């Protein structure tokens, strides 16, 4: 899930590994939603011992009847959900734990907030959510409209990254994290599964360099599991992929030199 992935990256970047534990659901989301069914990617809920994500929502609110979504920031002392909104959790991880052991790196710095907010407002509807609009479209017209918007957005970001190492300037911010989690999934999943196949990210020199740049930051690679990402999408969306066959490719080298240091540190 690209939204949950944002929070895992921020946890790594802020050095919160020992302060905030994680549980990870099974990559397959079936008719009963997310579960902690045993699998290589699953990290069981060691705090409450639940088998299904919905049980956590029920623990927090016995009357809860909505969807059980990820990510969740869970308060194990209060046995409560602090937040299940990824944007909120990313902001919390960025600053709320600085006094108890997180490093001082700021990914939402005051001087850049206007630019960060502007890029977030552009990237979310056109890319983060745009690929889903294309993938789950049920008419040709809706699909073409969504897919066209995706590639128009990629063109705009490609142009921006030609002259700026990161979206808001020379330093990494939360806007880049939000962009990265969509781009890292694009060639393995969205290009084929969601029919966003006009071009691949590897066909955009600056986008592809950006993906490798962020991937190679300390700790980020630990949060990327392409096999699990592919398994989730291709197995969990029977209306899009009825056979649930997971493709074996593509072969991508995220560790290759990116050369983006020339744009500033």
Question: What does each model-found stretch correspond to?
Answer:
Residues 2-265:
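C-terminal alpha-helical interaction module
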């Amino acid at each position: 899930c690209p939204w949950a992935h944002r929070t895992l990256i921020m946890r790594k970047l802020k050095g919160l590994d020992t302060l905030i534990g994680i549980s990870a659901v099974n990559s397959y989301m079936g008719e009963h939603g997310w579960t902690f069914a045993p699998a290589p990617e699953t990290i069981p809920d060691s705090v409450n011992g639940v088998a299904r994500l919905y049980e956590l929502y029920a623990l927090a609110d016995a009357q809860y009847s909505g969807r059980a979504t990820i990510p969740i920031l869970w308060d194990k002392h209060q046995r409560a959900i602090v937040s299940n909104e990824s944007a909120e959790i990313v902001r919390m991880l960025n600053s709320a734990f600085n006094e108890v052991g997180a490093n001082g790196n700021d990914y939402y710095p005051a001087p850049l907030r206007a630019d960060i907010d502007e890029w977030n407002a552009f990237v979310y509807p056109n890319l983060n959510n745009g690929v889903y609009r294309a993938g789950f479209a049920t008419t040709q017209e809706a699909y073409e409209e969504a897919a066209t918007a995706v590639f128009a957005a990629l063109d705009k970001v490609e142009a921006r990254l030609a002259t700026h190492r990161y979206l808001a300037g020379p330093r990494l911010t939360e806007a880049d994290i939000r962009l990265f989690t969509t781009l890292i999934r694009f060639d393995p999943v969205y290009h084929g599964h969601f029919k966003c196949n006009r071009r691949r990210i590897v066909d955009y020199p600056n986008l592809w360099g950006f993906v490798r740049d962020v991937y190679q930051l300390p700790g980020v690679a630990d949060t990327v599991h392409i096999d699990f990402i592919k398994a989730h999408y291709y197995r969990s969306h029977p209306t899009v992929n009825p056979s649930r066959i997971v493709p074996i490719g593509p072969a991508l080298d995220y560790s290759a030199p990116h050369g983006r240091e020339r744009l500033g540190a």
